[in-house]
């Protein structure tokens, strides 16, 4: 059957466009490995165009944004707290297993790449240099990621919320 207004064509992948009203949700989605476009400088028009051009689901608490004609897929996020917002979105799409946890830059949304410790040694704090060996780098902003205390804290928070995270692969990094 061909697409109609009530049955638009299917999404190729679960990708999101997040607005300022649910900004912290973007970082949580990225933590799980979802492609979640967000930039605080984006206005409603830019978000709507991005969603239309890239086949993204718009997540917002702004009804006016979601009523824009260009938006094919959107969700009015009802929860007020970021973790509750995440669970609301995951429930909506029937997702409980994180697709690729700790694989994206929380700031840029870019997929992280493994980096040899020797190449970034000069950028590491002394204790990080001593205790950690697997690192990933954001090719866009240059941020370095590793499985430190923040990583463990986020795993615990997400697991306690019911999100299924695969066991860590030490060779893969965060």
Where are the predicted features?
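Short cysteine-rich clusters marking metal-coordination/redox-active sites
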Residues: 105-108, 138-141
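Residues immediately within or flanking Cys/His clusters that coordinate Zn2+
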Residues: 102, 135
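Long, charged N-terminal interaction/targeting segments
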Residues: 1-100
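Short cysteine/histidine-rich metal-coordination sites, predominantly Zn2+-binding motifs
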Residues: 119-130, 153-164
């Amino acid at each position: 059957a061909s697409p109609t207004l009530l049955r638009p064509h299917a999404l190729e992948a679960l990708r999101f466009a997040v607005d300022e009203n649910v900004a912290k949700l973007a970082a949580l989605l990225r933590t799980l490995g979802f492609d979640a476009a967000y930039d605080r400088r984006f206005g409603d028009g830019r978000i709507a165009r991005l969603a239309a051009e890239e086949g993204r689901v718009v997540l917002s608490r702004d009804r006016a944004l979601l009523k824009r004609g260009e938006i094919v897929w959107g969700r009015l996020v009802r929860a007020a707290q970021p973790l509750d917002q995440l669970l609301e979105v995951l429930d909506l799409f029937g997702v409980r297993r994180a697709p690729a946890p700790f694989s994206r830059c929380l700031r840029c949304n870019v997929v992280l790449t493994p980096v040899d410790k020797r190449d970034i040694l000069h950028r590491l704090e002394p204790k990080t240099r001593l205790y950690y060996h697997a690192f990933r780098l954001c090719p866009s902003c240059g941020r370095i990621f590793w499985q430190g205390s923040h990583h463990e804290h986020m795993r615990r928070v997400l697991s306690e919320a019911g999100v299924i995270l695969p066991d860590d692969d030490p060779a893969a990094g965060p």
